[in-house]
Curated annotation (Swiss-Prot):
Signal peptide: none annotated. This is Phosphoribosylformylglycinamidine cyclo-ligase. GO terms for cellular component: cytosol. Belongs to the AIR synthase family. The lineage of its organism: Bacteria, Pseudomonadati, Pseudomonadota, Gammaproteobacteria, Enterobacterales. The gene is purM. One of its GO terms (molecular function) is ATP binding.
């Protein structure tokens, strides 16, 4: 009889003990995100959450997203502490533009070999994003998959569910000519356009940690977490009649603003109403990127655009500013002729 070595899951590259250590490490930060509607804690087969009692006709709103190749930049620079904020932001910002209050969030973290310190850093960032948006982190999946990822590489995805009163859903149907567009400033490129960012860094032979812009490194500018607008927008919605909100993500101005415009409507943007933050000017110059491509790829300093009646625009700017946002009137809604562009950016 031949003696054979007894193999374990750990021999195959999956360390269950490391996974358990990770859960123990993150329990405290996860607990800080708890909402009263959440039933139970981590470790169940599924997470239970009641609907807030204030809703008469609650409609659930769901979303899922990742952070694109911003994650590659974060891994290359070994900065894992804020990418989780980006992950939450990309999901909850998509929910709030429809008037929804985020309720709970789940994450998916996949890697070839689990580094507990890295994973804990990422998930701590996710918990921070949940706190900023008033959302409970109710669970997630940590997948250690040998042979699927190179070295210490990992990927993340997020899933969020929110709730909105049926009569208060914001879907753009109320947008009308004469509405004013109010912009909310972005914290940076947020989580979009990073394949182009990385190409520009490569072609221009730029080390982002050794390049300075306005007193901080280019790396800091590029890895600045995506701004979470949930609390500011929910507060605005409670006080004013909002007709539409666009979250400027992949596709920039040209593709995201039309998503909330009815047929026959056109957004006319005044480019002179704001100055691009330095990081966007640097990217355009270093990559010789056309103006059209900049507005197609990046937010160029505008994270969200709100459409509302003209007589409420000044009040909206005032309220958003009081909430800590940089806000300004960026344009108007006009009637569009058949076949006309839905977004015009006037220099």
């Amino acid at each position: 009889m031949t003696n054979k070595t007894s193999l374990s899951y750990k021999d195959a590259g999956v360390d269950i003990d490391a996974g358990n250590d990770l859960v123990d490490r993150i329990k405290g930060v996860v607990k800080q995100t708890r909402r009263p509607e959440v039933m139970g804690g981590l470790g169940g087969f599924g997470a239970l959450c009641a609907l807030p009692q204030k809703y008469r006709e609650p409609i659930l709103v769901s979303g899922t997203d990742g952070v694109g190749t911003k994650l590659r930049l974060a891994m290359d620079l070994k900065r894992h502490d804020t990418i989780g904020i980006d992950l939450v932001a990309m999901c909850v910002n998509d929910l709030v533009v429809q008037g929804a209050e985020p309720l709970f969030f789940l994450d998916y973290f996949a890697t070839g070999k689990l580094d507990v310190d890295t994973a804990a850093s990422v998930i701590t960032g996710i918990a921070e994003g949940c706190k900023q948006s008033g959302c409970a982190l109710v669970g997630g999946e940590t997948a250690e998959m040998p042979g699927m990822y190179h070295g210490d590489d990992y990927d993340v995805a997020g899933f969020c569910v929110g709730v909105v009163e049926k009569s208060e859903i914001i879907d753009g149907s109320k947008v009308t000519p004469g509405d004013v567009l109010v912009a909310l400033g972005a914290s940076g490129p947020h989580s979009n356009g990073y394949s182009l960012v990385r190409k520009i860094l490569d072609v221009s032979n730029t080390n982002p940690e050794q390049t300075s812009l306005e007193g901080k490194s280019l790396a800091d500018h590029l890895l600045e977490p995506t701004k979470i607008y949930v609390k500011s927008i929910l507060s605005l919605i409670e006080q004013l009649d909002i007709h539409a909100i666009a979250h400027l993500t992949g596709g920039g101005f040209w593709e995201n603003i039309p998503r909330v415009l009815p047929q026959g409507m056109q957004a006319v943007i005044d480019e002179a109403s704001w100055q691009w933050p330095a990081v966007f000017s640097w990217l355009q110059h270093a990559g010789n990127v056309s103006r059209h491509e900049m507005y197609r790829t990046f937010n160029c300093g505008v994270g969200m655009v709100v459409a509302l009646p003209a007589e409420l625009a000044d009040k909206a700017v005032e309220l958003l500013t009081a909430s800590g946002e940089k806000a300004w009137k960026i344009g108007v809604i006009a009637a569009a002729t058949e076949g006309a562009e839905q977004v015009i950016i006037n220099p």
